[in-house]
């Protein structure tokens, strides 16, 4: 894919940068793999806001994506690459030799007509899924499981990938894009290559309305609120922040570490912030 800078024919188009989608399927998605997706607008069952800045936006169907890739030994042909409004990555529709169709995260470089296979005997080829024990050290991988059979949880967004650094007994060491090195069970599966649509991060939406289409509402600065609404609020005129930047609930907002899962601490070999002091 490539990016294109739009001509400034209006205020909303000026500065807009979008990803060219010429190779994507233009028709409707595959209906049997669609599910209803309800919008909660960031509210819980009591109507209370649990996630701020959410609401509105276009209606979507959820595309059921196969993150397990457990149909072993059966070749699958890539029918088409599609846009998915629920994620930054594109998705590929696979048609297996037995006629079943499934969506997967589209790896970089995959095009319609490619043949993919999953299983321990699959070749080391972009788009194929294997147990980590069968993948050579130094291979770039994505869609990585954290527990065998649970389905991919790591490196699923556009342009994401990880590198297999080492394999020792029951665990392998994988370096993530953040710099974190993590232990993964060698029976977990991963897909060869990196996720496509890597230029997603270069996109510029151009106008506030484009965020509203995505269901993202405006973000109000705490310093312009009242004291009852935010720790930064209040004062006569422009007062600035009278304390270190914090969230509306008083949690430090700049670099404060919030991880609190001692149960899996031993699975992290190197922290992602180890070089940040």
Swiss-Prot record:
Residues 50-60 have a biased composition (Basic residues). Keywords: Ribonucleoprotein, Ribosomal protein, RNA-binding, rRNA-binding. Belongs to the universal ribosomal protein uL2 family. GO terms for cellular component: large ribosomal subunit. Disulfide bonds: none annotated. The keyword Cell membrane does not apply. Pfam families: Ribosomal_L2, Ribosomal_L2_C. PROSITE patterns: RIBOSOMAL_L2 (PS00467). InterPro entries: NA-bd_OB-fold, Rib_uL2_dom2, Ribosomal_uL2, Ribosomal_uL2_bac/org-type, Ribosomal_uL2_C, Ribosomal_uL2_CS, Ribosomal_uL2_dom3, Ribosomal_uL2_RNA-bd_dom. Residues 39-49 have a biased composition (Polar residues). One of its GO terms (biological process) is cytoplasmic translation. GO terms for molecular function: rRNA binding; structural constituent of ribosome; transferase activity. Part of the 50S ribosomal subunit. Forms a bridge to the 30S subunit in the 70S ribosome. One of the primary rRNA binding proteins. Required for association of the 30S and 50S subunits to form the 70S ribosome, for tRNA binding and peptide bond formation. It has been suggested to have peptidyltransferase activity; this is somewhat controversial. Makes several contacts with the 16S rRNA in the 70S ribosome. This is Large ribosomal subunit protein uL2. NCBIfam families: rplB_bact. Residues 229-244 have a biased composition (Basic and acidic residues). Residues 37-60, 223-265 are annotated as: Disordered. It comes from Neisseria meningitidis serogroup C (strain 053442).
